[in-house]
A protein has these predicted regions:
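Nucleic-acid endonuclease domains
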Residues: 1-81, 88-187
């Protein structure tokens, strides 16, 4: 795996947090998902991932469209050469790292991605997450990792028969992700 490590600036964290506070009206309203603060932090994690991917596309001089949605619906995260890229972001605890984690996809989100003609899914991990509190520690969150990508339709090959949580209908091991450099060559 040829992951890319990217430092996370305070400005990026602040921009992502402001976005999360706007998005809370439209996301993570499922019963039992946790406190309002925990839900904001889940959106914050996703927003950091999107901004990190945007930064990496810019650094690689790849032209793209970006939808940093704060309304009810979004059509895509990124579009490059008319190909839609979805970005999934998960937090990890520094002491445990991210290598044991997987790309998870919920059934309803996967079906929506197929309807919207998603081409690729990129997995990003950020440090500083506390799994017990389900909160991101701003002071410990300083690095993101673009772990790789998968062609979106291939996610269906990873149906998770041992589903334990909301959102783990599909479970893609990191070893099955392609290096992000390969995606960039195809753009």
């Amino acid at each position: 795996m040829n992951e890319i490590h990217i430092p996370i600036s305070d400005d990026l964290k602040n921009e992502a947090y402001e976005h999360a506070q706007k998005r809370i009206k439209f996301e993570y309203d499922r019963a039992g998902y946790g406190s309002r603060e925990q839900r904001i932090h889940m959106i914050w994690i996703g927003s950091i991932g999107q901004l990190l991917f945007k930064k990496n596309l810019e650094e690689n001089k790849i032209n793209f469209e970006f939808e940093f949605q704060a309304g009810k619906y979004d059509a895509y995260d990124f579009r490059v050469n008319n190909k839609i890229i979805d970005v999934k972001t998960s937090g990890f605890e520094d002491s445990k790292g991210y290598k044991y984690l997987n790309l998870f996809y919920a059934e309803d989100q996967f079906a929506a991605g197929l309807r919207k003609n998603y081409e690729y899914c990129v997995q990003i991990f950020i440090n500083g997450y506390n799994r017990i509190d389900r909160l991101l520690d701003r002071t410990k969150c300083n690095e993101g990792v673009i772990a790789g990508y998968i062609e979106f339709h291939k996610i269906k090959e990873f149906k998770n028969p041992l589903k334990r949580f909301w959102g783990d209908d599909y479970k893609v091991p990191l070893i099955n992700l392609e290096p992000i450099s390969k995606l960039y060559k195809n753009m």
